[in-house]
Structure formats: C-alpha cells, structure tokens
Amino acid sequence: IRDAARTSIGSVMPAKSLELKHTIKLIQELTSEINEIEDAIRKIMDELKPPILSIPGMGFYSAAMILAEVGDFSNFNSPDKVLAYAGCSPSTYQSGKLTNCYAHMEKRGSRYLRYALYTATKYVCYWNPVFTEYLTKKQAEGKHYNVALSHATKKLVRLIYALQKSGKAYLAIT
C-alpha cells in the first residue's frame, strides 16, 4: 500500500495525474541540466582562477556572469568604458557646444552585466569593510540607498578592472 501511495497522485481525473507526472519528470530533467551546467561553469572558473574571486563578498556565479558578459578586459581602455558597456554611466545630452550630464543611468548596455554588478555590489558592500564604509559615507552625504549603491558599483567596476588587468589578487587596505 505504501509503494502504491508513493507512486500515485491523489486525483480522480487520469488526465490531471498524467499531466502532473509529466510536469514532475520535466522539473527533474531541468534540475539535472541546471546542475550539469553549474558544474561546467565551476570547472571553467576553477581553470581561469580569476582575481575578482579574491574580493570579499564576490560570489562565484556573479563573477562568472561578469566575466562572461565583459569577456576580455583588454577590449576596454578604462573602467569607464566597462561602466558604459554595462549601462551604468550617467546619461548625457549634447547639442552644439552644450554638453549636459543628467543624474540618471543610461541603462543602454548589457542588462545581464548590470544585474550581475548590482547583485555583486550588494554582497561586496556587506562583506567588505572598505565598501561598507564607502556605502555608509555616500548615504551620509544624503544620497538614496540605490544611488549610493550605484556609486559603490562604479567603485567595484574600477576594482574589478584593475584586478583583471594586473592579474593580482585583492588585498584589503587596513
């Protein structure tokens, strides 16, 4: 009876129970595919040994997303170009000799990179005292949390750029 109860579904309609069995099987297949892909990402990251993983609070998958989206950092002349690629640079308006800078982010770049940087910044600000202090300083200046976090994101991009260009691990300044 117990075996029958484990394999059966509490539904009178056979179509619903068949649909549920197929849905469960599909979820199990997708879960195994996700695990396989995550293992492949982990192997690639173990081979690369990127210096950005030495930043306290930098997550494994955030680092993988950032590296996958940016690719080769030598394609960018400066961290500002990486910020612009992510869509985190301030929007500008130009007409003739007038150049005006607005306070809003452009959000024209890679939304995946922007998401990975934003998520990584939250954790780095929590685990890294240098970034925690920077975030607190920006909030003390009267900036909204999200604005302060965008400033911390810019600081993180500058750090990631420097680490990837130099190939050296992060050393905290105490």
Which residues does each predicted region cover?
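A detector of single, family-specific signature residues
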Residues: 1-174
